Regions:
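Local sequence-structure signature of Cys/Sec-based thiol-disulfide redox active-site neighborhoods
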Residues: 1-37
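Broad hydrophobic/π-residue packing in well-ordered secondary structure
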Residues: 6, 57, 78-80
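General "foldedness" signal
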Residues: 17-19, 40, 52, 68, ...
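Generic alpha-helical propensity signal that fires on short helical segments
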Residues: 21-23, 53-56, 77
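Generic hydrophobic, helix-prone segments enriched in Leu/Val/Ile
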Residues: 34-35, 52, 84
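Thioredoxin-like thiol-disulfide oxidoreductase module
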Residues: 39-61, 88-90
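Acidic, low-complexity intrinsically disordered segments
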Residues: 62-66
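Non-catalytic, surface beta->alpha helical segment in thiol-disulfide oxidoreductase systems
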Residues: 67-90
Length: 90
């Protein structure tokens, strides 16, 4: 399983407030160690890796998680607690 976290970078270069909050929760819980990749969706760069992933998965908010397993469709989570409940805790 591969887990990707997409964080938003605002036009002024700062991280979005919700992204900072989710990163704190991931670090505090220890779940950050299970995240394989963290990419940025830069508002100033529509070709940034995170913006491309957002378009590919039809997501219009950040942060979001993409969970990939071989032979299965990707699962996308835009709600932190749902992601934790369904992917981290089972």
């Amino acid at each position: 399983m591969k887990i990707t976290l997409v964080k938003k970078v605002l036009a002024d270069g700062s991280s979005c407030r919700k992204c900072i909050d989710v990163m704190g929760k991931l670090e505090q819980s220890g779940y950050i160690e299970r995240i394989d990749e963290i990419v940025s969706a830069d508002e100033k760069d529509p070709d940034s890796p995170g913006m491309k992933l957002a378009r590919e998965h039809n997501v219009d908010r950040a942060p979001f998680f993409i969970v990939q397993e071989a032979g299965q469709p990707s699962r996308v989570y835009t709600v932190y607690y749902q992601f934790v409940r369904e992917e981290m805790e089972p």
